[in-house]
Amino acid sequence: MKQEIKPATGRLGVLVVGVGGAVATTMIVGTLASRKGLAKPIGSITQLATMRMENNEEKLIKDVVPLTDLNDIVFGGWDIFPDNAYEAAMYAEVLKEKDLNGVKDELEAIKPMPAAFDHNWAKRLNGTHIKKAATRWEMVEQLRQDIRDFKAANNCERIVVLWAASTEIYIPLSDEHMSLAALEKAMKDNNTEVISPSMCYAYAAIAEGAPFVMGAPNLCVDTPAMWEFSKQKNVPIAGKDFKSGQTLMKTVLAPMFKTRMLGVNGWFSTNILGNRDGEVLDDPDNFKTKEVSKLSVIDTIFEPEKYPDLYGDVYHKVRINYYPPRKDNKEAWDNIDIFGWMGYPMEIKVNFLCRDSILAAPIALDLVLFSDLAMRAGMCGIQTWLSFFCKSPMHDLSLIHISEP
């Protein structure tokens, strides 16, 4: 059946949570520079990848699929620091000043709205540009008004909300997350132990008919309550946790081992990172959220229950170390102990000197554009087709058929 897709007319507002962060400013600068012809959108599937047509001709995806043109994007968002996007990008030190100056006027015009923030969910951050709300429900109402105001002020036809802020502390799924009614009650009761700021952003976005993308490993839209709400409002949700650096390498190597039926005894991964993300993850409660996300990758690929002789006893360790001198230039080391024919051992060492935000920025842009496409195509709920971009891709348990034994 042919899918009817509404055209990408008018302006698309992209509201970023953490708009002054390294990932957000890098994405914004690159997008603005690309549409001025000052840079190429390297790493962006929506902008550079091709698809094969019926006659074997290759065409750019953006020339076939009705994606929003970069010229029609308007950026805005929230941040716990008041700096405009130019000042924030200078602070992040991801990009050279000469690359910022080409779009300086546009960056200076992007001023963050006060953020919905709770210090208890990111203890290493101490922002001053913060909303005052008596309850989580009031926080949601303020965010909804922000979305409406931005949409009207910038004459936007559509909005996408993107979480590019820090990783929140780890919390397990609880009763308050199991239904929309329970979630809303917890927000109104101001249950700050189980309702995170990111959940308030997600709820506000969905309530305003805006797709929501979760770029961190937070427990947020991967809950039955949010699945229910997104379907009720016919809004797409996507996530979670951008698959950009070390985990990207894992998802390349692990399928190779499995395809060749090579066994794995152990996989040790460590990183050093010096940006605000690294600072937040230096707190054990926040690191646990990231650790759970990063550890989940290889089990899903290896299927140890199916191949116990090869992957039934893999020792998998992940560490992230805050090291300020490196700033955004993350370095990742992996030691992989594998075994082959007749059980003989071998080792693989991977040393990836990467730029964290340079890898994440095009992922963020692609998820925004594809989420907007999904909205115009009438798709709602979890967008499993966007799993490729995420460390912990979400899935709706109600869609999984479990056979009776």
Regions found by a protein language model. Give the residues of each.
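Residue-level detector of conserved catalytic or cofactor/ligand-binding positions
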Residues: 398-405
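C-terminal non-catalytic interaction/assembly regions of soluble proteins
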Residues: 373, 385-398
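Residue-level signal for secondary-structure boundary elements
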Residues: 39-40, 155, 376-379, 394, ...
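Generic structural "secondary-structure junction" signal
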Residues: 25, 221, 322-325, 388-392
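N-terminal Rossmann-like NAD(P) cofactor-binding subdomain of oxidoreductases
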Residues: 2, 10-19, 23-251, 255-256, ...
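Active-site-lining helix/loop region of Rossmann-like oxidoreductase modules
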Residues: 15-18, 22, 228, 246-384
